């Protein structure tokens, strides 16, 4: 379910500014972290990523053009990194502060329902998002110091196995 919502959110960011987006998609990013930016900020960062595509102005550059261990760490900490970099570079206006406070309270309310279950959910969510972000940004878009789009390593046998497993 999370992956479907994230894909819908990604497509929406390319088409719709903040006022046109419904609450359901806005809440999609809620449970990633208590320090999470809102849709408006995510959209600005995402469009900047496409504009600079791995270059110096790309907010995702630390996931793409760094050594694999650092890229993995950055991928695991995307929400927090984005939050602190946004606040450092642009400040915390009243709208963002209110949105962050509401999202943090909702995050903590969900944690309070059942902390152990939430911790298991949250760790698996963060690991799956972080690892998939690492594969997408670093493995597919960085090769031997170059930035671009590259095929996954592994050769024909891995592709056959993938087709057999996933169709």
What are these regions (language model features)?
Residues 5, 9, 110, 131, ...:
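Alpha-helical membrane-inserting segments
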Residues 124-167:
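Alpha-helical transmembrane anchor segments
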